[in-house]
Amino acid sequence: MQLIIIYEKRILMIRDMKMTDAEANRLINATSLGYDISIEITKKQMVKLLADVNHHFFFVAEENGLVAGYVHAELYEALYSEPMLNVLALAVDQKHQKKGLGKQLMQKIEFVASELGLIGVRLNSGETRLGAHKFYESIGYTSDKFQKRFLKIIS
């Protein structure tokens, strides 16, 4: 399903992610999120995750035919909460930020959550990403706690 918006001589489209978006996604991850991984790993993860259509949800934003951002959410189910969508990544290329693409991507995820009968959308945002925090608040999200992430690499 596609959403096409024509706004101030810009053609914006929100559509399902596809494998041909791999290089654009890799570049956006590196420049906007700081996760610089290889194209091989990007493609490997996309093959696996795009196939899991009942658990992972991916959409890209195109501006004038070029991938300018994406959102990735997963079904979040726990014993202590009703099901929601959990946004794992929202990334918009730096030169396309502040043009409404992130808002459109989040609205798409909210629509999917509603269509699935879920109670809402949740996400985590890094402590230092103050601009992102301001953005999420501007579109109706509230911060309900602060956390630390613990990580142990085992391989």
Would you name each region that the model predicts?
Residues 3, 148-155:
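Terminal substrate-recognition subdomain of acyl/acetyltransferases
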Residues 17, 90-92, 125:
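Hydrophobic adenine-recognition pocket in adenosine-nucleotide-binding enzymes
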Residues 106, 113-124:
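Conserved GNAT acetyl-CoA-binding A-motif
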Residues 16-19, 27-83, 88, 108, ...:
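Acetyl-CoA-dependent GNAT
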Residues 92, 98-111, 138:
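Conserved acetyl-CoA-binding loop-helix of GNAT-fold acetyltransferases
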Residues 1-20:
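Conserved N-terminal entry element of GNAT/NAT acetyltransferase domains
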Residues 122-132, 151-154:
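Conserved beta-strand-loop-alpha-helix junction that forms the acyl-donor binding cleft
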Residues 103, 115, 127-146:
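Conserved active-site alpha-helix within GNAT-family acetyltransferase domains
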